[in-house]
Amino acid sequence: MSIASVASVFKGEHAVGSTVTVRGWVRTRRDSKAGISFLAVYDGSCFNPIQGVVPNSLENYDNEVLKLTAGCSVIVTGEIVESPGAGQAYELQVTQVEVTGWVEDPDTYPMAAKRHSIEHLRELAHLRPRTNIIGAVARVRNCLSQAIHRFYHENGFVWVSTPLITASDCEGAGEMFRVSTLDMENLPRTSDGKVDYDKDFFGKEAFLTVSGQLNGETYACALSKIYTFGPTFRAENSNTSRHLAEFWMVEPEVAFATLSDIANLAEGMLKYAFNAVLAERMDDLQFFAQHVDKTVIERLQSFVSSDFAQVDYTDAVEILQKCGREFEFPVSWGIDLSSEHERYLAEEHFKAPVVVKNYPKDIKAFYMRLNEDGKTVAAMDVLAPGIGEIIGGSQREERLDVLDMRLEEMDLNKEDYWWYRDLRRYGTVPHAGFGLGFERLVSYVTGVSNIRDVIPFPRAPRTANF
């Protein structure tokens, strides 16, 4: 007996005429008057289920096979034959069906209905991977993850695991989740009435990280090329389709690199990842094109064949001001570009992915390198047609005196960043990096517009079930 995934059967990895065993769940059962049942069995290895043709001669046909409903788990053994019907190349002539798990009450099984709204599925996050759409999202998400790791490995990067618990606020925004073991009902106090964090687990205030970047820089300044890939947290009270409180970030950091270098790195990484999805997950992409967003395949193909445009922030503002479009948010030099501005640039003006660079210093973080004009920093955003910003990055400020000045300007205590400042005191180097919000990438590739539907268990304001 050979255990086979549904995907391996469809790929022709098992000879026609060979006997295999497929383990999975029933999607549908259809009975014919000729005493044959057709079971659609899926195991999650690919989009389509495999059809099993079950004769009524099986010993358990009447008392088990005819009672199978959507969601029942089965182990099906049979001979691979070429399928006479359209839609799939192979099917199984079943010789044995073992039922490993029944659905207790098929009438109340939440996934029994043919179609649920995506909003309703969020309330059933523990069962929604069984649906076509969330299963397809999971496979694409995995494909993108693996491709990103391969890309960095093939380009000589070291994967660094940065801490999830930190005392540093990378963005200087203060929107952080506190980590504490103090008794909330009986908080220790200092003499002036403030919470005494000396008595806490770490002996100081601690938070969930908003970014692995600062820690990543320490390793880039020793190993030259590193990347992080892990969860980050923002206590941002935003109930939108674009925000999560817990999400994953890809953050490369490169020593001796300029803003131009990481713009090229971002382009290479995105094209590598998108090409992987086009090559490996076309079955899922075809589903998304049919049921979610008809442009997904064409959009990815266009992306990987396009050269990235580049434009200075100042020039981008001028383009937006002169385009004749009335935007909801008026455009002026010094504002942070909104999604409508970003999408106009990528979709209508350049009609290609675009790198906007050299932003005003007052709207960017303290660690971004100050340009010679004293007004802008060496920062960039990568804007993609169909979604807007997908990557944000910068050349880092490697000059200690300028870094200290920026910390002071932003009312940040430089003593809190003593270790980060040490990198500038001991063999400082120009270096640069960027951050990619991974869920936003999955959303772009699948066309699934709400970011809560491209992560297994979304965390958002007042949403922490499961």
Curated annotation (Swiss-Prot):
Subcellular location per the Swiss-Prot or TrEMBL entry: Cytoplasm
Main subcellular location of this protein, as a coarse class: cytoplasm
Domain of life: Bacteria
EC numbers on record: 6.1.1.22
First-tier enzyme category under EC: ligase
Listed Gene3D superfamilies: Bira Bifunctional Protein, Domain 2 (3.30.930.10), Nucleic acid-binding proteins (2.40.50.140)
Family, similarity comment: Belongs to the class-II aminoacyl-tRNA synthetase family.
Subunit structure and binding partners: Homodimer.
Designated name of the protein: Asparagine--tRNA ligase
Species of provenance: Shewanella sp. (strain MR-4)
